[in-house]
Swiss-Prot record:
Name of the molecule in the record: Capsid protein
Keywords for the protein's UniProt record, in alphabetical order: Capsid protein, DNA-binding, Host nucleus, T=1 icosahedral capsid protein, Viral penetration into host nucleus, Virion, Virus entry into host cell
Originating organism: Beet curly top virus (strain California/Logan) (BCTV)
Upper lineage: Viruses, Monodnaviria, Shotokuvirae, Cressdnaviricota, Repensiviricetes
Disulphides: none
DNA-binding listed as a keyword: yes
Family that this chain belongs to: Belongs to the geminiviridae capsid protein family.
Length: 254
């Protein structure tokens, strides 16, 4: 086709449309119709429901004696079962700990002006043995007959990969020299005798415990990672000067 202008002319042609140059259609990957296909269900992130286990210290209101010899106890005594405080499988994860306890000094401690400090540890026993560590010397680098000043205690060199300290803290007891609940004339401003509350929260512990195929919840039923609570009084007079611990520790696990 010719197109004339005043001085010259140009030739133009209609462009032929190639049907193959158009955008290709999207092929269906499945042979079934779309309306008959199964849809994937929508899953929601549900909050994890934790179980609770209470470990009582000092049953019957008597309390557990805390001396310079120390006290070692296992906290995650989860028996296998279907209850809210029992484990359903051989692998558990302890998330949080909550201590609701109280400390009380001995009667001889209140009769004279005294000051005592208690040292507390949360320790993970990674390589559980056949015998429970009843002595402090099996964990700390101290003599077998004990040692004063618990603030200097350190994990044994040959046990530093087995016993892992997760948390430690201190508590104090102070006496004015009068029996608990007794009367005295005014002498000077002083701290009154009292029971020391101990409310400690240990969050995000996330300790994974592997159990043996025994179904029990004792130390010998654990294959890996037992949760230990250790407490020591700094007064070496274990006969007259000691502390008493009341209350329980609640373990949150799944």
């Amino acid at each position: 086709m010719r197109k004339y202008t005043r001085n010259t002319y140009t030739m133009s042609q209609k462009r032929k449309v190639n049907p193959q140059s158009a955008w290709p259609k999207k092929r269906r990957t499945s042979t079934t119709s779309r309306k008959y296909q199964w849809r994937r269900p929508v899953t929601k992130n549900r909050t994890l429901k934790l179980k609770m286990y209470d470990d009582m210290l000092g049953a019957g209101g008597i309390g557990s004696t805390i001396s310079n010899n120390g006290m070692i106890t296992m906290l995650n005594n989860y028996v296998q079962g279907i209850g809210d405080s029992q484990r359903a499988r051989n692998v558990t994860v302890t998330k949080h700990l909550k201590f609701d306890m109280a400390l009380m000094g001995s009667s001889q401690f209140w009769e004279t002006p005294n000051y005592m400090t208690q040292y507390h540890w949360i320790i993970i026993d990674k390589d559980v043995g056949s015998v429970f560590p009843t002595k402090l010397s099996s964990i700390f680098d101290i003599p077998d007959n004990g040692q004063a000043m618990p603030s200097t205690y350190r994990i044994r060199r040959d046990m530093n990969e087995r016993f892992i300290v997760k948390k430690k803290w201190r508590t104090h007891l102070m006496s004015t020299g009068t029996g608990y609940g007794g009367k005295e004339t005014y002498k000077a401003p002083s701290m009154p005798n009292y029971k020391k509350p101990m409310n400690i929260n240990v969050r995000n512990l996330n300790m994974r415990t592997i159990w043996k195929d025994t179904g029990g919840g004792k130390y010998e039923d654990v294959k890996e990672n037992a949760l230990l609570y250790v407490v020591v009084n700094d007064n070496t007079d274990n006969t007259n000067m000691y502390a008493t611990l009341f209350g329980n520790c609640r373990c949150y696990f799944y």
